[in-house]
A protein has these predicted regions:
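The conserved cystathionine-beta-synthase
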Residues: 32-50, 56-58, 75-76, 86, ...
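Membrane-interfacial segments at transmembrane helix termini in multi-pass membrane proteins
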Residues: 1-36, 143-159
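Bacterial c-di-GMP phosphodiesterase catalytic domain signature
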Residues: 69, 73-74
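Amphipathic coiled-coil signal-relay and dimerization helices
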Residues: 62-67, 125-129
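Short proline/glycine- and basic residue-enriched helix-capping loop/turn segments at helix->loop/beta transitions
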Residues: 90
Length: 159
């Protein structure tokens, strides 16, 4: 009966997140890292802003991703002055603003990461975290009839 309970919970989660996309919750103000920055500098940003994971960006292009768990592990190995470029994951594809949150959450779980970079037309826009998705789900659950905001030209990623 555990599998049936998990399936029912997944259906409920899917219903709560239905219609919500990345653009509804991602943070455009998230810190980003330059590949030449040291891991120590990345850790300083982690402490300063409470952000766990980071997009690695050159110009406006995402070139990698540094999950918090990778950063902490490297710092425990006494490697604070290693450049971010040596540790970053190079094959983490950014998500787009129009992607459904349920799909983004599933991908985070599968890839075992707590955040993903957000990009549109190859340009870095920000970061979406699993915590943001969980918070939205809790808000939607508390206000069950709450409908997702409508997509308008004013909140489109092109503006």
């Amino acid at each position: 009966f555990t599998a049936a309970g998990q399936e029912a919970q997944y259906v409920r989660y899917r219903r709560l997140l239905s219609g919500y996309t990345v653009q509804h919750v991602y943070s455009a103000a998230a810190y980003r890292l330059d590949p030449a920055m040291s891991l120590r500098q990345a850790a300083d940003l982690m402490l300063l802003g409470g952000q766990k994971s980071f997009a690695v960006v050159e110009g406006d292009t995402v070139v990698g991703f540094l999950p918090g768990q990778d950063l902490v592990s490297a710092l425990h190995s006494s490697r604070p002055f290693v450049p971010v470029a040596e540790l970053m994951r190079r094959h983490v594809e950014p998500v787009m603003p129009g992607e459904e949150l349920i799909d983004v959450e599933r991908r985070m779980i599968e890839e075992q990461i707590d955040a993903l970079p957000v990009a549109f037309a190859g340009r870095y826009l920000g970061l979406i975290t699993h915590d943001q998705i969980i918070t939205l789900r809790r808000l939607a659950s508390a206000a069950a009839p709450m409908a997702p905001p409508r997509h308008t030209a004013a909140n489109s990623p092109a503006n």
